[in-house]
Amino acid sequence: MELRPWLLWVVAATGTLVLLAADAQGQKVFTNTWAVRIPGGPAVANSVARKHGFLNLGQIFGDYYHFWHRGVTKRSLSPHRPRHSRLQREPQVQWLEQQVAKRRTKRDVYQEPTDPKFPQQWYLSGVTQRDLNVKAAWAQGYTGHGIVVSILDDGIEKNHPDLAGNYDPGASFDVNDQDPDPQPRYTQMNDNRHGTRCAGEVAAVANNGVCGVGVAYNARIGGVRMLDGEVTDAVEARSLGLNPNHIHIYSASWGPEDDGKTVDGPARLAEEAFFRGVSQGRGGLGSIFVWASGNGGREHDSCNCDGYTNSIYTLSISSATQFGNVPWYSEACSSTLATTYSSGNQNEKQIVTTDLRQKCTESHTGTSASAPLAAGIIALTLEANKNLTWRDMQHLVVQTSKPAHLNANDWATNGVGRKVSHSYGYGLLDAGAMVALAQNWTTVAPQRKCIIDILTEPKDIGKRLEVRKTVTACLGEPNHITRLEHAQARLTLSYNRRGDLAIHLVSPMGTRSTLLAARPHDYSADGFNDWAFMTTHSWDEDPSGEWVLEIENTSEANNYGTLTKFTLVLYGTAPEGLPVPPESSGCKTLTSSQACVVCEEGFSLHQKSCVQHCPPGFAPQVLDTHYSTENDVETIRASVCAPCHASCATCQGPALTDCLSCPSHASLDPVEQTCSRQSQSSRESPPQQQPPRLPPEVEAGQRLRAGLLPSHLPEVVAGLSCAFIVLVFVTVFLVLQLRSGFSFRGVKVYTMDRGLISYKGLPPEAWQEECPSDSEEDEGRGERTAFIKDQSAL
């Protein structure tokens, strides 16, 4: 019995070698698809296909259709005559042919770019393998062709000689000035050069004798001018939602202040733009948002306090120096997914790219330079497989990133054997590995979301608090998860000095994520209000079992606070089973890559599969959807599972007012069908028993005291405080006047009729601030009169 797997492996390997040898010798290799001519329209073709166990992949043109059969070997040296004969005997079939695999090669001849600065782009062409392996992707023929990237920043110099050839006006807009032109505003200090620099990293034109090359040098590049003015929630949302069925990738190298004390993230509109982007962008495959993790390392900042990099919808990218070290500006956190190269110390090279005023620079720096490099690599990967979803891309990053050559003292092995670091995520992006894996990638199962309320009552944090909870990851429910992607700890807590807190989350498989490290500059007493700390470190782990939350006071001070809410939110996928046969999946029309685009009646499209019931968090809706053919993008109307509004748990539609149920932290308004978040102050107290009635005279006394104390005590205290301050001021004033020889006779302290304050009884030299005193007595008098002037001004 032990030999059977080996025998199967040997047989499979032998068959593969035979096919390869036959292909090399020019023999025909038959596939499991047929081209069939059937007059009468798609309905007749579908009927014939179903009758004989075929699936109609769609109309080729005219009366010609593309049939597929799952029971036929995908590649064979001989045709499948029984299936062919039965189909041929069908009277509606006028012609058919089993399709033969043909050898086709791209006519690109790969040569290294000839641009003058290319040899200095060490991160693309490293001689010691310390690079992003981009040339391996280029050698496979992928240069970003057909992919559109937009830089959300301070504009893009669209007429730059190294950008103009790839500039895409459809991926550009000026949100600051409300016009289509993203040209940056020029200043003497070149303040608005950031976006142009980022754009060159992605798609600088190759072999034009100018500067260097972009990672995806045949991609289309655009820019959104949105940072050169007031940045509001509306500005961010408009930028994130620009032309989502044209733009594939959005690259952003900005965020809240990296000062080590700010906790901030996207507001309502921007959060909605993210959600709409991943659920509706790219025809439902999801927009890809690439984000720089932050430059607050010197301030001991944490990128988990940045709600943009901490979002499950963004692909957060950190930096490594030329020699593979953690840069001084880098922030460590558990939401970072991967790393690219950037600047480091003075003896390490920086990034070469386009610069403002049609120039070139060799000194682009920070995580601002890392995110565009990642966007370029993702563009190469999308060219290899345009059907990748936004979550597919994150899976590819996790599976192909390389920890090698990166130095850090916190590398750990998670529960599925992958190395992961808070400084680097899963390691350096590998462009060659990503495009190779993407070509035959199978779309991940639909995302599931499991919400678990952990706390039943508030808990005192003290010096150290540990909360343990064993969970089943929604076992027995439609949203049961067995393979984890993102995990969030949504915390509400109070603390007198937030920066002294360190928070960790330990998964059932033992992976310990640092959700928050101590931030010495954060003196805030605001705590956290339903803040979602996110970790990617347990990717692909089984989330069932005991989770442990650790909250620790890292200082010696006797700090105090209370944890009032802890919700564990798990995102992942269902158990992997056998693939559903396409004939019984409810799919009506597939693309050439066998991705479903139209479902039969009674089914809705969800993540390229047809389902009779949309999963929790989605509702059926008829929408215009887009899918890519070989040469174009087609628009069709189809029933799809549209995501609920971000505030709803379940819904009957995508609008804010379509909620059917709410998350645990919100309540449903049955009239407006909206979910409103509950605050601590708005929650009703439990009913209490009525106290026994007191005698009338006692009750009257209590009413008298209650009427005086609760309602008037603040006013009384405020009045007494003001009177005391005035008394102290008058006393000090009089004492100083007496010490100065002040006389009360004939004093006129001030006049207000001309808006002036004139002092009497003071020597004239007291007002001559520029004149030096002739004696210590005059100096003392000058100090005192200065004090009086200050107090009078008050």
Swiss-Prot record:
Annotated site residue numbers, Cleavage, first: 107-108
KW tRNA-binding (keyword) present: no
Keywords, sorted A to Z: Autocatalytic cleavage, Calcium, Cell membrane, Cleavage on pair of basic residues, Disulfide bond, Endosome, Glycoprotein, Golgi apparatus, Heparin-binding, Host-virus interaction, Hydrolase, Membrane, Metal-binding, Phosphoprotein, Protease, Repeat, Secreted, Serine protease, Signal, Transmembrane, Transmembrane helix, Zymogen
Activity profile over pH: Optimum pH is 6.0.
Entry comment describing in which tissues the protein is expressed: Seems to be expressed ubiquitously.
Effect the entry attributes to changing residue 775 to A: Slight reduction in phosphorylation. Loss of phosphorylation and abnormal accumulation in the early secretory pathway
Regions annotated as coiled coil: none
Subcellular location, principal: Golgi
GO molecular function: endopeptidase activator activity; endopeptidase activity; heparan sulfate binding; heparin binding; metal ion binding; nerve growth factor binding; peptidase activity; peptide binding
Propiece residue ranges: 27-107
Protein known as: Furin
Lineage: Eukaryota, Metazoa, Chordata, Craniata, Vertebrata
Gene label: FURIN
